[in-house]
A protein has these predicted regions:
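N-terminal accessory segments that position/regulate proteins before the catalytic core
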Residues: 1-357
Length: 357
């Protein structure tokens, strides 16, 4: 299985839409929240203070600051403004209640899970944790220095972003892997921007041995490591490193559905993307320039709401009003400028993604 083969087999067409007889099995919808039974659950401080730096400044690469005094306060701020529940809504027809989160997700299905390793945080045990957004808590799955064992990295805070493909496959079937990658990108940038608003920087790693990371993070078979993000910076409250012995608790992951279906095509493409040896990232050449002319963009807009306010009130656009409520050309120029900011990642040495309007 190659990327091109997967793309051809799962791309939309008039014929594929006509043939489909898929329906949504609401009785078997996957649980959007993973948790682990039999582990210690660590409460994070409620209502953490909002980062006051403007959203546009964060998008432009400027760092904010935090008054967090210990690991719990810093982690609470970081997760509250990157991956927590931001609102709840009720379905008028059924009365069912569903949650919205800070990080966007296609179909609001949230295949991404946030695992993290801590090292040297003030008043916080070194170890492996899983963030539980349903209660804004951290599940302690192991004690010890897992970060350096995981990827030989000395960052005090290392996140492993994973995907549970079944959550997307329930709706999108074989196309689900596309959405898993899409959502990983959303989660990565939500985490990166929240960290920046608190005075920290990040570096993402997509080049790692998948099976080794999955084993080190005690992941179940239905959950795949997709991206590793290390955080560093003077704003992270640190003390001298502990030398705690490694103790593994593990925990039993909850069952997400009564019936969890498998999709061989998704399994095949994921296997094709995995690294099993210490190989290097293939080098890609620069694409040829296209277009017939250049347009000089106007000056950026300066007024902006605070980062904390923006991310907590973000919603998905269901329609576009247009007319007088359309964004201005300077506003568009500001957004375009933000998309050109450098990505700090081991796969960003070449220009893999290009934006066309």
């Amino acid at each position: 299985m190659t990327w091109l083969e997967y793309h051809e087999l799962t791309k939309h067409s008039a014929e594929s839409l006509r043939r489909t007889q898929h329906y949504l099995d609401w009785a078997n919808i996957p649980n959007p929240f993973r948790h682990y039974e039999g582990v210690r659950v660590v409460d994070l401080p409620v209502d953490p203070p909002a980062p006051q730096i403007s959203a546009l400044e964060v998008l432009g690469g400027k760092t904010g600051n935090t008054l967090a005094r210990d690991g719990a306060e810093f982690l609470s701020q970081l997760m509250f403004y990157s991956a927590s529940i931001s609102a709840s809504k009720r379905v008028p027809s059924s009365g069912a209640i569903y949650s919205l989160r800070v990080n966007p997700s296609s179909g609001n299905l949230h295949p991404t899970e946030f695992h993290f390793c801590t090292r040297g945080l003030v008043d916080w045990s070194d170890g492996l944790y899983h963030y539980r957004p349903s209660s804004h808590t951290a599940e302690q799955r192991a004690i010890g220095d897992f970060g350096t064992k995981l990827i030989n990295n000395s960052a005090p805070l290392i996140f492993v972003l994973t995907s549970i493909a079944w959550r997307e496959a329930w709706k999108y079937r074989d196309r689900a892997y596309r959405y898993c990658l899409h959502d990983i990108g959303h989660a990565w940038q939500a985490l990166t921007l929240a960290a920046r608003s608190l005075g920290s920087e990040s570096f993402a790693m997509g080049h790692f041995l998948d099976d080794r990371v999955a084993e080190s993070c005690l992941l179940s078979a239905d959950e795949w490591p997709m991206l590793i993000v290390g955080l560093h910076g003077p704003s992270i409250p640190l003390n001298k490193l502990n030398a705690d012995e490694t103790v593994v608790f593990g925990g039993q992951p909850n069952r997400l559905s009564e019936e969890q279906k498998t999709y061989p095509l998704i399994e095949s493409i994921h296997t094709a993307t995995k690294l099993s040896t210490e190989s290097t990232i293939p080098s890609l050449g620069e694409p040829k320039a296209s277009g017939r002319g250049e347009i000089t963009l106007p000056s950026h807009v300066s007024a902006s709401r605070s980062f904390g306010d923006v991310v907590r009130t973000r919603r998905s656009a269901l329609d576009f009003k247009g007319g007088r409520e359309s964004i201005s050309f300077p506003q568009l120029a500001t957004l375009l400028s933000a998309t050109g900011e450098r990505l700090f990642a081991d796969f960003a040495t070449h220009r893999y993604v290009h934006l066309y309007l």
